[in-house]
Amino acid sequence: MKPYGKIPDNSIKSLQDLMQLLKKSKDFITLEIASNNSSIVISYFRTLIDVNIFHEEVLTYIKEKSFNSLQDIHSVLPFENSKITNQIEDIQDSILNGYILIQYDTDKLNCLLVNVSKKEKRDITKAEIEYNIVGPQIAFVEDLDVNLNLVRRKLPTPYLQMKELKVGSLSNTTVAIVFIEGIVNDQNLQEIIKRVSQIKTDHVLDSTYLMQLIADNPNSIFPQFLNTERPDRVAAVLAEGKIALFVDGSPYAITLPTTLIDFFSTTEDYTMPWIIASFFRLLRLFAFIFSVLTTPLYVSILTYHYELIPKELLETLIISRSKVPFPPLIEALFLEITIELLREAGARLPTKVGLTVGIVGGIVIGQASVEASLTSNVLIIIVALSALSSFTAPIYRIGNTIRVIRFPFIISAHLLGLLGIVLTSSLLLARLLRTESLRRPYLFPFYPTRPTDWKDSIIRMPISAMFRRPIFSRSKQRFRFNPEEVEKNKILSRNDFDD
């Protein structure tokens, strides 16, 4: 892949040009070894290779034996990922990924590439962002091969297929497109391959970069694709006919296409009885609405609609605001911004310190602001409950969206009261109706209406009732299993018990 921008894209025309450029770097090493009246030149980046393997399994063989050609060296070295080539781009990519370059002085055209790369890996740990009490606990890591291994262990089928693409003219990052052959919709697959192939940028360092580059509408504050750290979640969406993207160096996978409801479901929902899982899903959706609308309703009612408040509650509000010199808008914005500052500070500081700052800071600032008559104690309770409700979102990115859209609602409530809240809600709904994920409607299965997919939306029906794959993914195989066989087995089980 040729670099863009100010980096010259025609400076490397031969192997000699490449070697001259690489030798400018202090960590690029070149060794020369005599063999049968000829010389063998070995070049590599010492920061990219495993030095122990290189000395024990490469240098030892080359120094102890005599060779007459590159093919002789190739046949002796005990490495599978080795090749003889004269392609400059292939040589460049290989050296920069931890290969060593071996040249034989009688062969000026070809060279041998041997993979002795060193990759630093961290151990597989528990999921921290999408933590579950019940169910699998492991999470992805930054190594692409490890992540693909975790998915294959969840779905050990030959129909699980992977395609790899390179993106980023400088980073040359590997992107793996994972799907199940025979279930995935070909149109979806070709569309995502097209989008990834058309990326023109110099670096892609994480899956979040990729999400922005392939989004249907990159200016939307609503996430159009879901990124997850859980292998079980990826396996589940692949079985539905969706697609997963992995970026080398990122501990998160991207699943697509996605609906808004997907951001309020968890893998733990499928480990519970369906009634309990449905209750928690409804609770999360209610918390989403509560978090967005509660503070704007407070501003609206205190600014325009006192008559809507019961007399006893109105007296309490008047007493709590009697010494506050600011209008409800300034009061609400002050507390909301304070909460956001505490969140951001807690997230950036070390875990224990951040937790302390969040708790102590919230208590101290809240108490001090009431005593200083900057805010009312009622609003502190409302803002605290709104913040708490936003934490129920199981996906971090949708939680950020909730935090942002609350502010336009507060301002519109101050300007137009309840009418402003209704207008802002209408504009938000209109925007969501136009939003797409991989050219699929974001509010599916409610718009367009598909009752067959309601079984796993705001509620979750029993798994035995979800024998069809979602229409949304347009999978080739609509049925997960034959429902008649399930019912037949139930009848046989009852008959066996009765006998």
Curated annotation (Swiss-Prot):
GO terms for cellular component: membrane. Signal peptide: none annotated. InterPro entries: Spore_Ger, UPF0353/GerABKA_families. Its main location: membrane. This is Spore germination protein GerQA. The chain crosses the membrane at residues 285-305, 376-396, 409-429. GO terms for biological process: spore germination. It is found in: Membrane. Keywords: Germination, Membrane, Transmembrane, Transmembrane helix. Required for the germination response to inosine. Has no role in L-alanine germination. It holds the Pfam family GerA. It comes from the Bacteria. Belongs to the GerABKA family. It is a multi-pass membrane protein.
